[in-house]
Amino acid sequence: MKKIPILLLLTACWSLAAAQEKPQTPAAQKRKPRTEIIAADSTGELLAQLRNMPNIEIGKGITFRPKNDWFELTMRFRMQNLLALSFDDDFTLTKTEARVKRLRLRFDGYIYSPKLVYSVQLGFTSYDTEPLPGGDMNIVRDAIVYYVPNATWNIGFGQTKIKANRARINSSSALQFVDRSIVNSEFNLDRDFGFFGEYNMRHGEGFNLSAKGSVTLGEGRNWGSSPTGGLAYTGRLELYPLGRFKSKGDVIEGNYEFEERVKILLAGAYSYNHKASRLKGQRGAVMPGDATRNMGSYFVDFILEYRGFAFYTDFMGRSCSDPLFSPETGAFVYNGQGLNVQTSYLFNKKWEIALRNSTLFPDSEVQPLAGYRNWNQTTLGITRYIIGHSLKVQADMSYNTRSRSIHPDYNRWEIRFQLELGL
C-alpha cells in the first residue's frame, strides 16, 4: 500500500545527509523552526515526527493521529457529476439534467479512546440540502457518537441512517448503477435522530448474524422537534449462513472483492412510526391540517455473491390504516409494495455489467392519486472501475412502463452518465 510517509522519510534522509556535509554556524543552530521535521537528533525522533504526519490513502481519506493516540481524525470527500437525458415514447428529448448531484464531506475517527467513535457527514448540493418546512438548514447528514465496548456491541446517539433496507444502508458511493432503484426511492426511511444499537455475532466462516435497532424522533434528519409526541421504532435482523462478506461486501453493490466462496445474506426489517407528520414517515411533505398517521414499513433483502457474480433482491412496502386526506389537498400516504431484482458480473476488476428490474405496486385505494396501477423500470448499467468505487465512470439506460397511467406522456427512456471521485 503506497503511503505519503514513505516520501517524507526519503526526503528526511536526503536532508540529513546534506546537513552533515555543511556544518551550521552557532547563529544558524539557534534558528531551528518549530515545524521542521528533518532535523531530528535521532532516528527514533524522526520516526516519531513522521508518525504525526497525515496518512493519505485513496479511498480511505486523510488520517491524522498524534503520537499519544488520544484521538484520530479521518477526512474524506467525494463528488458525483451527472448528465441525464429523458425521452418520451417517440424518443424525443424532453429533459436534460446536468449538475453536481452529490458533494459530500465526511469526518470519522475517535476521541479520548478508540471506544468512543464519531462520524460527521455534510452535503452541499441542492440534491443533498432539500429545504425543510420552516426554513431549517438541511446540510448535516450524519452527526453521531458511538460507544463501542468491543467488536460485538455498539450504541450510538445522534443522527444517521436508519438500518432498514439494504439499498439505503449502502453508501451512494458504492452503487453499481448511477442511482438507487425507484422502489428504494419510494419506501426507504433515510435518516433520523435518536438512539441506535447493534449486535454482531462473528464466527469466522460459519453462521453469523447481526441485530440492529433504533428509537428515533420519526420526522427525519434535521427536523429538530416533534409536537406530536410520537417516535419511530425500527429493528433489523441479518443472517449470514456461510459467513460474512469480504471487506463489508454486503453493503457494497456488486462483487468487487471477488468472493472465492459463495456468500449469502438474508435480512428482514420492520419500522413502526407512531404519529408521523410527514407523508413518507421520515421523508416527504408535511401532512395537511397538522394531521398525523401511524405507519408501518417492512423490508426483506437477499444477497448472493460468488467470484465476480452478484444477485440482489429487495421487497419492501408501507402500510397506513388511513392513507387519504381531503380530495382538494391531493395528499396521500403511498400504501403499497415494491420489488427490486438486480444482477451483475465483474470482469477483471475493471468492467462491470449490471441489469436491474424494479416494480412499484400501489394499493388500489391510492392508485388514482399515484397515477398508475403499477410502475416498472428496467435498467442496464455499465461501470468502469479505475480505483475501485473511489474513481469510476458509470452509464446506464432505463425504460419505464406504467400500466393504466393517468398521464400517458410520461418519460419512457432515460440515459445517464456519471463520474465519481472520492478520497
Identify the function of each model-found stretch:
Residues 101, 139-141, 217, 272, ...:
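Transmembrane beta-barrel architecture of outer-membrane proteins
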Residues 228, 238-242, 246-363:
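Detector for outer-membrane/organellar transmembrane beta-barrel domains
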Residues 61-87, 92-221, 227-243, 339-347, ...:
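Outer membrane beta-barrel
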Residues 1-25:
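Bacterial Sec-dependent N-terminal signal peptides
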Residues 341-393:
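C-terminal hydrophobic structural anchor segments
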Residues 233-244, 382-386, 391, 410-423:
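Outer-membrane beta-barrel "beta-signal"
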Residues 19-78, 248, 423:
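N-terminal periplasmic/intermembrane-space "pro-region" immediately following the signal or transit peptide
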